Each structure stands twice: as C-alpha cells, then as structure tokens.
A protein has these predicted regions:
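Compact, well-ordered interaction domains used in eukaryotic information-processing assemblies
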Residues: 62-67, 72-99, 105-109, 115
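A diffuse structural propensity rather than consistent per-protein peaks
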Residues: 6, 86-89, 178
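Short N-terminal edge-element motif at the start of the domain
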Residues: 2-79
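Beta-strand-rich cores of mature extracytoplasmic or soluble domains
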Residues: 93-200
Length: 200
C-alpha cells in the first residue's frame, strides 16, 4: 500500500492530522489495522478475566503451538486485582506466572469470557514444558497413575518418556482446553478435570 494513501487513511479514520510530529513504524501500523479488521489475536495481547469475589485477573497470549493442534498458548498471571484497579500492562507482565495453558483465545472473546485489555510484546520465555498422557480417562473414584507420558516445549518435538521423570513434574498439563475450562482454571486456580491421570 502506498505510504501517502496510508497516511490519508490514518488522518480520515484515526484523527492523526499532523503525522510529521508522530513517530511510527508504517509496517506496524498496517499490521495493527489489518489484524483489528480481521479480529485477529496478536502475540503479546493481554486479556482481563472477571473472577469471583469482585476480582479480576489477567493473561497474555504468547503464540500458537504447532505441537498441540495449533492451540493458543497463554500465560496466566498470579495476582488478582480489585474491580476498581487499572494496572498498566507493564505491571501486569512483571507479575509471577501462575500457569501456561492452551486454549482458543478468540473464541473466549466471542463467548464473553474475557476482554482485550492491552498489549506488550514481551511474552516472556517460551522454554516451557508441557506433558500429556496417552491413557487419559478412568472411572469415578479410581486413581490412575500413568506410565505413558509425552513431553514437549512450545513448537518443539514431542518426546515419549513413559513414566514421567522427576525433571518434568513441574511441566504444565498439555491439553487444548475449551475457553470455558480455561476461564474456570483462571477463576478458581485449579483444573476442572475429574479423570486426568496422575504421574506418581
């Protein structure tokens, strides 16, 4: 797109009448306009989730994980805020990470489970391990310890390890959670999974 046409679009639609005094990266501006028009979720986007007791929490979209059905990887921050609080995105991302999980961020927006809050390109480390078991599911009340675990990093090769080595005990559960299940985890700090196997 011609830069002069782009400037005219910005003037007409965004009220930027004196572009000489505004420093911006043209490609970034075009990307933001395009993704906004397409309702696309950008890496670094931060979302607000209303949780019980008149509190709210935040998570950040990290990237897609080709190793798990191209699911959206999010990192959920630990702190809960009062409904009247207005933290900056810098304050939010400096918080401790509660968990990483896979979900469908755009679907959660459409369902009204969370709302866009802001964006920061700092998405933290992607050197995060996930784990999943091949024998998911058991009868109510039955305690299953799996010896069929697979582990992987975001967009990395999946590695079958059998009995889960201790070094992967802290790996996050690698399932593609529905937006409703993700919202439950963010709200209550636990997964709503009755039949997921244990590792020991």
């Amino acid at each position: 797109m011609d830069a002069r046409i782009t400037e005219q679009i910005l003037i007409n639609n965004y009220g930027l009448e004196n572009l000489d005094n505004i420093k911006f990266n043209l490609s970034e501006v075009l990307e933001l306009i395009w993704n906004k028009a397409m309702n696309r979720v950008l890496s670094g986007n931060i979302f607000e989730v209303i949780v019980p007791n008149d509190q709210k929490r935040y998570f950040q979209y990290v990237c897609k994980d080709l190793s798990l059905l191209n699911g959206d990887v999010i990192r959920v921050f630990s702190r809960s805020y009062a409904m009247t609080a207005s933290p900056t995105v810098e304050e939010i991302i400096c918080d401790e990470v509660d968990c990483y999980m896979h979900t469908a961020v755009g679907a959660g927006v459409k369902f009204g489970l969370w709302t866009y809050y802001g964006r920061n390109k700092n998405v933290g480390s992607k050197e995060v391990y996930f784990r999943d078991a091949n024998d998911y599911g058991h009868y109510p009340g039955e305690r299953i310890v799996s010896h069929n675990w697979t582990v992987w990093k975001i967009n990395g090769e999946r590695k079958y390890v059998g009995t889960l080595p201790e070094e992967y005990y802290s790996a996050y559960i690698g399932l593609l959670f529905s937006p409703f299940s993700a919202a439950y985890r963010i709200s209550y700090g636990r997964y709503k999974m009755l039949y997921y196997p244990l590792y020991r």
